[in-house]
Amino acid sequence: MIISSSTDYRRAAQKRLPPFLFHYIDGGAYAEHTLRRNVDDLAEVALRQRVLKDMSQLDTSIDLFGEKLSMPVALSPVGLTGMYARRGEVQAARAADARGIPFTMSSVSVCPIEEVAPRLSRPMWFQLYVLKDRGFMRNALERAQAAGCSTLVFTVDMPVPGARYRDAHSGMSGPNAALRRYAQAVMHPRWAWDVGLLGRPHDLGNISRYLGKPTGLEDYMGYLGANFDPSISWKDLEWIREFWKGPMLIKGILDPDDARDAVRFGADGIIVSNHGGRQLDGVLSSARALPAIADAVKGQIKILADSGIRSGLDVVRMIALGADAAMLGRAYIYALAAAGQSGVDHLLGLIEKEIRVAMTLTSVSSISQITSELLVREP
């Protein structure tokens, strides 16, 4: 199979993965309108092509929170990454590390923080949910700091889990889910051998270490379902801001007023995100929400964006809409599932090449030159 894009990796991942895992990463909330709009709205962003400029010297690098990135891209936190490839968090993190960009470790990962961090040459980022179990939150923060994680990504758009219809149909949840997952694994022997057997343990590493006992997929659903906290407010985040010594990003911002609140709170950055269309169907796509947020807080706080990004061209579009950098989620999981670390490395190489092509054809030689001036203004 010829692989030349994240779309190709998606097809390859679908062939390799049991349906419950493919649809868990591929699906969204409710009827998935926002999931589709994330991609479609970004694809509708037209850029101004400029020609006959000397573009022989391009620089895709940026400085972000004191770190030098080879391109304006970071890997988003994705729960259960270690179910998509053998010790998947390690493989994805190594690929990001080799390409000179940050990997964000999910707090609900398969591999624990301590398994991943020592294998990298640069600090990784760490993501945390708002949970009723404040003991777990504090334990995770302490371990992340001890492991040298540089930046905290605090996800605030999951006070309750989204309604994901696909999960019930695919076997991730619903009646006889465990039996259905087992039957699917038998029908996908390459995954069953490489990940199902050789990728053990399939604990949720960070939660298991806190609870002192193994936590599998059923425990994952039960623990999170019981611990999401709908009472959370900005006040509840104050102890985290005081405890965490490094940069702190608030993930899940879609409204300019929330972005202004993040500035007042003292966050170092925000991530414009609708959780990849996995939480509330019918909200704005990140591409549509971003310009108003940038108008409200640009220059006061760093702005990152995810949801719908599938190519280097999409990265350039997001930056032109107002972001300082973009984050990849599904795209790298498709590559990881299809080809492990080498797949993620290859995808990131494609992303960087696509960024360079877009910069050349819009006549910008550095990321700082990608502004709203690149956007085609409709009459």
From Swiss-Prot:
InterPro entries assigned to the protein according to its UniProt record, in alphabetical order: Aldolase_TIM (IPR013785), Alpha-hydoxy_acid_DH_FMN (IPR012133), FMN-dep_DH (IPR000262), FMN_HAD (IPR037396), FMN_hydac_DH_AS (IPR008259), LldD (IPR020920)
One annotated Gene Ontology cellular component of this protein: plasma membrane
Membrane association type: Peripheral membrane protein
Main location: membrane
One of the Pfam families matching this protein, by short name: FMN_dh
Binding site for FMN: 106, 127, 155, 251, 306-330
Cofactor(s) this protein cannot do without: FMN
Catalysed reaction equations from the record: (S)-lactate + A = pyruvate + AH2
Gene Ontology biological-process entries: aerobic respiration; lactate metabolic process
Residues holding substrate: Y24, Y129, R164, R278
Active-site residues, Swiss-Prot/TrEMBL: H275 (proton acceptor)
UniProt cross-references to PROSITE patterns, sorted A to Z: FMN_HYDROXY_ACID_DH_1 (PS00557), FMN_HYDROXY_ACID_DH_2 (PS51349)
Positions in coiled-coil regions: none
Gene3D superfamilies: Aldolase class I (3.20.20.70)
A GO molecular-function descriptor: L-lactate dehydrogenase activity
Compartments where found: Cell membrane
Domain FMN hydroxy acid dehydrogenase: 1-379
Enzyme Commission identifier(s): 1.1.-.-
Alphabetized UniProt keyword annotations: Cell membrane, Flavoprotein, FMN, Membrane, Oxidoreductase
SUPFAM superfamilies assigned: FMN-linked oxidoreductases
Family: Belongs to the FMN-dependent alpha-hydroxy acid dehydrogenase family.
Cited function: Catalyzes the conversion of L-lactate to pyruvate. Is coupled to the respiratory chain.
Identification of the protein by name: L-lactate dehydrogenase
Species in which this protein is naturally found: Alcaligenes faecalis
